[in-house]
């Protein structure tokens, strides 16, 4: 593939943008090489500025569940734009969005729109602290909840890729209020709550870890956390920025049958546009200003264009069989990847929940952060570049989940597996 135009753009970007990008993982620092620059996207494909086409398993990091540039979403955005971009005042679409979310996710009796997943998680933590009168929060090793100071303690995603467990610039006094647990460890959670449970305002978790690759919860683990939180008066917060409306119509909480106190959502409710939301029980949400004393605000929150895009997308994914079909195709992709690896003499394991999947270069079933970090990262990097050379774009980090959309049809999956049969041979080194 020719990448002359992308190389020229990256050279210019490095002079003006830190690392040449506006979000760290895009720089390919973990896998090596340089990123390609996207010109357009359609369906299951990205097209770069040099005219190369890629099957896309990043999906703008999750929200493109109906594929890129879907006609219904695009038309909804065009119609909204005809009436203006942002009002700084209430609009009908944000009410319809709230009605839709509360109907599809019953644990959210009320919601507040924000502009990103990070805003949603930061706001949820503030609400948990304000509602309980406590200061400590609990998160999990390898889980990423945005770039808020409270979360950059043993974080995942870009932080894990960079190998930095905590970020400079986070005050020690603040980071000391964040307690970190190993994911999927029943005993550690029990012990922590026995020692400090009555001081913990909230426990925030990705119900399926998507920022240390894709790690599902062990049987009964989420229920165990629910019981601990209930016993100690701690708010259970599900970060469904990745899993919401993707692993099931009602998110991971519907898939696993667990009811959190608060839930955060991200860009998927904007059809890929910048948006987020958090919601929960009415008595909690009523404590947010102006109904209550816990302050949170945003000029662009609930803006009509993002709401229109999100509503169009949410209507599409409510079609009968949508999620079951996506889950079946994701499982078929994972089975095909394992078979292709075995044929090449490469040891891999896969995970999948709904339309999320993970690929690990290890013989172990990966259930913990420690297992994820012990995988053969150089082998993944070789595999990544071999797939990219054949026009398949995986996340440029061994610590990120993959995503399918309804545009990933049988032909796309078979083309992916054909590329994988070649790429696994390159991964052997």
UniProtKB/Swiss-Prot annotation:
Q: Which PROSITE patterns match?
A: AA_TRANSFER_CLASS_3 (PS00600)
- Gene3D superfamilies named in the record: Aspartate Aminotransferase, domain 1, Type I PLP-dependent aspartate aminotransferase-like (Major domain)
Q: Which UniProt keywords apply?
A: Cytoplasm, Isomerase, Porphyrin biosynthesis, Pyridoxal phosphate
What is the main EC category here?
A: isomerase
Q: Which Pfam families match?
A: Aminotran_3 (PF00202)
Using the record's annotations, give every residue carrying the modification N6-(pyridoxal phosphate)lysine. 267
Enzymatic reactions: (S)-4-amino-5-oxopentanoate = 5-aminolevulinate
A single GO molecular function term of this UniProt record:
pyridoxal phosphate binding
Choose one Gene Ontology CC annotation of this protein and give it. cytoplasm
Q: State its cofactor.
A: pyridoxal 5'-phosphate
Specify whether Transcription is a keyword of the entry: no
The pathway noted for it is: Porphyrin-containing compound metabolism; protoporphyrin-IX biosynthesis; 5-aminolevulinate from L-glutamyl-tRNA(Glu): step 2/2
The compartments listed are:
Cytoplasm
| EC numbers on record | 5.4.3.8
Task: Kindly list the biological process annotations in GO that this record carries.
Answer: protoporphyrinogen IX biosynthetic process
Q: List the disulfide bonds.
A: none
Q: Subunit structure of this entry?
A: Homodimer.
Family label: Belongs to the class-III pyridoxal-phosphate-dependent aminotransferase family. HemL subfamily.
Annotated protein name in UniProt:
Glutamate-1-semialdehyde 2,1-aminomutase
Q: Which gene encodes it?
A: hemL
């Amino acid at each position: 593939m020719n990448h002359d135009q992308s190389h020229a753009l990256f050279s210019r970007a490095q002079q003006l943008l830190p690392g040449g990008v506006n979000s760290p993982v895009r720089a390919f620092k973990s896998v090596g090489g340089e990123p390609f620059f996207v010109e357009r996207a359609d369906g299951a494909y990205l097209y770069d500025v040099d005219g190369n086409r890629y099957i896309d398993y990043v999906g703008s990091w999750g929200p493109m569940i109906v594929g890129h540039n879907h006609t219904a979403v695009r038309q909804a955005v065009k119609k909204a734009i005809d009436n203006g971009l942002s009002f700084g005042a209430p609009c009908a679409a944000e009410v319809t969005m709230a009605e839709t979310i509360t109907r599809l996710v019953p644990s959210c009796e009320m919601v507040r729109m924000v502009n990103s997943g990070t805003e949603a998680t930061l706001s949820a933590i503030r609400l948990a602290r304000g509602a309980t009168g406590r200061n400590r929060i609990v998160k999990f090793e390898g889980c990423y909840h945005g770039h808020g100071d409270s979360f950059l303690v043993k974080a995942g995603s870009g932080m894990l890729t960079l190998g930095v467990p905590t970020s400079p610039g986070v005050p020690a006094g603040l980071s000391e209020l964040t307690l970190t647990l190993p994911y999927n460890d029943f005993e550690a959670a029990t012990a922590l709550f026995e020692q400090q449970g009555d001081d913990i305002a909230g426990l925030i978790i990705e119900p399926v870890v998507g920022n240390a690759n894709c790690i599902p919860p062990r049987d009964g683990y989420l229920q165990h956390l629910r019981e601990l939180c209930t016993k100690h008066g701690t708010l259970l917060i599900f970060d469904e920025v990745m899993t919401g409306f993707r692993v099931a119509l009602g998110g991971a909480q519907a898939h696993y049958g667990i009811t959190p106190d608060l839930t955060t959502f991200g860009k998927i409710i904007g059809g890929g546009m910048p948006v987020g939301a958090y919601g929960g029980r009415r008595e909690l949400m009523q404590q947010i200003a102006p109904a209550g004393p816990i302050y949170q605000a945003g000029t662009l929150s609930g803006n009509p264009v993002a709401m229109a895009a999100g509503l169009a997308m949410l209507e599409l994914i409510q079609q009968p069989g949508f999620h079951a079909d996506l889950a079946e195709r994701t499982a078929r992709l994972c089975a095909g990847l394992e078979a292709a690896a075995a044929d090449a003499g490469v040891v891999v394991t896969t995970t999948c929940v709904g339309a999320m999947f993970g690929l690990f270069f290890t013989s172990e079933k990966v259930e913990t952060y420690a297992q994820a970090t012990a995988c053969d990262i150089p082998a993944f990097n070789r595999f990544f570049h071999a797939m990219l050379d054949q026009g398949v774009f995986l996340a440029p980090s061994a610590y990120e989940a993959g995503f399918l959309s309804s545009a990933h049809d049988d032909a796309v999956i078979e083309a992916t597996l054909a590329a994988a049969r070649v790429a696994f041979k390159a991964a052997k080194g």
